[in-house]
């Protein structure tokens, strides 16, 4: 079995708070029976993840997103679930060499984003793309969500590769000029739990007040209590029960929100090119 590599906690105490899961834990998180007890993440605040700028009335920041601090929060999330923080997550040079990438246009490896919208606490994600093979057309991805944090609402359309290296098989150098079908995907919750949002299904957002209350103001007007850009009004709670959930309709709008302890979710899909993503919030960036 390969040794799991973990990084020492380097973020400030303000960045991410923990509460211990058991009262008999030692300083190293070990309980009286010798087993390591996971720690529980708490909800984050935008003020801890931006430099400069100010927060508006909705808590959205005009400052510069601190990617390093955001990554550290996800590493802490991983440790809270006893999920390994691999060397490839922390050593970019190693990751690029081992995955035979000449650049990061089609980025394999770990990343953290606020979608360039200043609302990381409610509108952000961490992710790693394990594989994305155009020749054989398959894709593997893990999604990391902090407590009550949402992925940007999005859909997938068919298209053609835009970047030259997206068309190139990384292992053989072969150029694969082919149309890309709309991405179809399924998800398996590994740790924590999520609220799943979809435009397919009966609108039932009011039955999930916690999820509704934590939607970003980019999507929902909380004072008027109505959606602005939000299209996905059917909500389900998915738990780590060994059941995979499939996107109900090709091209449909969807996203996830992490539960109260955050979540780690594995995604299975056909080949994916980010140029084929569409977002309800304008000018989303990575």
Which residue ranges define each predicted feature?
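N-terminal export signals
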Residues: 5-24, 242
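Bacterial Sec-dependent N-terminal signal peptides
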Residues: 22-32
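A short, N-terminal "cap"/entry segment at the start of jelly-roll beta-barrel domains
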Residues: 34-139
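Short, well-structured hydrophobic secondary-structure segments
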Residues: 135-137, 141-158, 163
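Conserved metal-binding segment of the jelly-roll/cupin
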Residues: 146, 235-259
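Glycine- and acidic-residue-biased ligand/ion/polar-headgroup-sensing regions
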Residues: 146-147, 160-207, 213
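Short hydrophobic/aromatic-rich beta-strand segments that constitute the beta-sheet cores
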Residues: 151-153, 194-198, 267
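Double-stranded beta-helix
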Residues: 201-234, 253-286
